Amino acid sequence: RKPVKGEKPGTEWYLSGHGAKRGIRFCAYDTNYWKTFVAQRIKTATGDIGSLTFWGHDATEHATFFSHMRAEYFTPTAGRGRVVDVWQPRPQHPDNHWWDCLTGAVVAASVAGVALTEVGTTSVKKEKKMVALPAYIPQ
């Protein structure tokens, strides 16, 4: 999809332009991409770059939240030369609101400019190395 004039494009999201109907702007995003992104952050080991962690040591304090996060599953699907994880609700497990909210919050952070170096535009500074020029190259 090509951006329309006035839109702000981002990583698998775009913010509508200022000329939107009734002056209301919205953010549209690829739900499958971002749910996969959040799931990868949760699977990343605590303390590693890009991990998403939760406060406390007692998992029962987050039982309802984690229940919502397990309310969907993904199926890898191939199309247009790539593989995409397509997320779907689990049967008999309708409550996924907090999973959707967590995903939306991560998208909102991206819209605000927060990024991991592996997916964002932020570059990692490389250490400069001093090298000696060969004798046959004039200095």
Describe each region flagged by the PLM.
Residues 81-93:
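Short, solvent-exposed helix-loop connector elements
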Residues 92-112:
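P-loop NTPase catalytic cores that bind/hydrolyze ATP
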Residues 119-120:
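Hydrophobic helices that insert into or interface with lipid environments
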Residues 1-82, 112-115, 124-139:
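Mg2+-dependent endonuclease catalytic cores in nucleic-acid-processing enzymes, primarily RNase H-like
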Residues 69, 87, 103-104, 136:
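Aromatic-residue detector
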